[in-house]
Amino acid sequence: MWTLVSWVALTAGLVAGTRCPDGQFCPVACCLDPGGASYSCCRPLLDKWPTTLSRHLGGPCQVDAHCSAGHSCIFTVSGTSSCCPFPEAVACGDGHHCCPRGFHCSADGRSCFQRSGNNSVGAIQCPDSQFECPDFSTCCVMVDGSWGCCPMPQASCCEDRVHCCPHGAFCDLVHTRCITPTGTHPLAKKLPAQRTNRAVALSSSVMCPDARSRCPDGSTCCELPSGKYGCCPMPNATCCSDHLHCCPQDTVCDLIQSKCLSKENATTDLLTKLPAHTVGDVKCDMEVSCPDGYTCCRLQSGAWGCCPFTQAVCCEDHIHCCPAGFTCDTQKGTCEQGPHQVPWMEKAPAHLSLPDPQALKRDVPCDNVSSCPSSDTCCQLTSGEWGCCPIPEAVCCSDHQHCCPQGYTCVAEGQCQRGSEIVAGLEKMPARRASLSHPRDIGCDQHTSCPVGQTCCPSLGGSWACCQLPHAVCCEDRQHCCPAGYTCNVKARSCEKEVVSAQPATFLARSPHVGVKDVECGEGHFCHDNQTCCRDNRQGWACCPYRQGVCCADRRHCCPAGFRCAARGTKCLRREAPRWDAPLRDPALRQLL
């Protein structure tokens, strides 16, 4: 929060300006920067708005019409929209206050300030708390699913996930323009959002009935036509029967007029639901997982731990981790990225993951050779073959092209009717042949196959399972597998590769002849073939039992080719990052004798 300096001089009418304690001259006023270490010029709100107070956000909304006159509907950092008692406003980072457009919020959100120049302070946090956009911009989802920034406040995000329009405008993608009540504007392009590089905050949210979807706090879960859940941007909302819209609490959906009706006969526009966020744990292996937004990292015990960053860097001490793009400085205990330095984080133990209930559901068989996904309904197509209606227990229409939700009847022109309500029918997709495997699949037996690049392994149930490695070794517990050339250590839950034990170096008497297959070290010493000469800590020679081995700086240990010495010579680390889906155990260090 900025601290105002020389306020008395300002109110006394010193239009000539004021001088900051650091000697800087400002035309109006001097403010202490948020960090408290420097000053900059500012202009407090003297005329229209209160000097030290912002305004509290009001009730939920989706458009300005849902707010009182003179108020505006703005997008907040929690992912919902609320009414702000300014006609044009920006949301503060605390999620509870707002300021007029053209101003920025203090750190605690209770004050509004305007800086000289165009540089804005602070940022708008995108809903997942990992990305942020500059002040007076809007978070919009990009084509790849990441967050982007539309360079205007409270913007309308277009369906192509590339463009955006001003607040209240409609995206006309066909003619590449934005349509407003006063005219048209060109489409604006979004820019990628910036990662905040701080730990993911698991904010409070509403869990939907499917136990896999979440909506932001202060919103309501409503089912979509697809059977999945969407979020109505207000608490305790009324979900409309078309599975597309919703209305505020204690109102009724009027789908014919596209309005929400209250007991006082007041009407508001229907609200459109937004897709819910699917809660998907990050899988470390078949048994262990971390929360969404975390990264799996090995602990010192060899078990999995959870780092509170996405795509994090796991530090070599197996205790700490750093944000993506940073490197671990084990001496300082920090994360480094050029001149930037942040504290590193400790990992938390991972938890056992439950099987995905959707993955356990079998396909719906249409006949002996055709099937549909578990949440679909088999309906015949005009060709006589089977098709899949994308909703469970659907009504198959007689035109063999459409289907309707349960409780509806098929009517003309591919529509569905229930009472006075009419919705568009759903088109069917061809069913898949259940008995034919993919032409490039690897057959386990006559009825079961695994994708190419994987290995068939016996499962606990007596059938087959797929190991996500080629030519893998199937472990005897029938739950795990290891890469080719490794053996399963079920007790340690690891994959191990046998390496020959260390051999002592042999001292030779001075002789002009050295064995043909021996490796000459010098000074009358040699090592056997497929070994490597290394200097020992007594300035003599020792033998590393690896061919082209790497001699560690402690002069007591060595590592195989392709590895590097770490942890002061007590550990070997691969020079190339291991596969994410094949957590292999590093070879044991060998003592030099």
Swiss-Prot record:
Keyword Signal belongs to the record: yes
The keyword Secreted appears for this protein: yes
Tissue specificity as recorded in UniProt: In myelogenous leukemic cell lines of promonocytic, promyelocytic, and proerythroid lineage, in fibroblasts, and very strongly in epithelial cell lines. Present in inflammatory cells and bone marrow. Highest levels in kidney.
InterPro entries, per the entry: Granulin, Granulin_fam, Granulin_sf
Gene Ontology MF, one: cytokine activity
Induction field: Increased in response to lysosome alkalization.
Localization, UniProt: Secreted; Lysosome
Keyword line: Cytokine, Disulfide bond, Glycoprotein, Lysosome, Neurodegeneration, Neuronal ceroid lipofuscinosis, Repeat, Secreted, Signal
UniProt PTM comment: Cleaved by ELANE; proteolysis is blocked by SLPI and is concentration- and time-dependent and induces CXCL8/IL-8 production; granulin-3 and granulin-4 are resistant to ELANE. Cleaved by CTSL in lysosome thus regulating the maturation and turnover of progranulin within the lysosome.
Pfam families: Granulin
Any one of the GO CC terms: cerebellar climbing fiber to Purkinje cell synapse
Family: Belongs to the granulin family.
Complex formation: Progranulin is secreted as a homodimer. Interacts with SLPI; interaction protects progranulin from proteolysis. Interacts (via region corresponding to granulin-7 peptide) with CTSD; stabilizes CTSD and increases its proteolytic activity. Interacts (via region corresponding to granulin-7 peptide) with SORT1; this interaction mediates endocytosis and lysosome delivery of progranulin; interaction occurs at the neuronal cell surface in a stressed nervous system. Interacts with PSAP; facilitates lysosomal delivery of progranulin from the extracellular space and the biosynthetic pathway.
Primary role: Secreted protein that acts as a key regulator of lysosomal function and as a growth factor involved in inflammation, wound healing and cell proliferation. Regulates protein trafficking to lysosomes, and also the activity of lysosomal enzymes. Also facilitates the acidification of lysosomes, causing degradation of mature CTSD by CTSB. In addition, functions as a wound-related growth factor that acts directly on dermal fibroblasts and endothelial cells to promote division, migration and the formation of capillary-like tubule structures.
Protein name (record): Progranulin
Protein's organism: Homo sapiens (Human)
Biological classification of the source: Eukaryota, Metazoa, Chordata, Craniata, Vertebrata
This protein's encoding gene: GRN
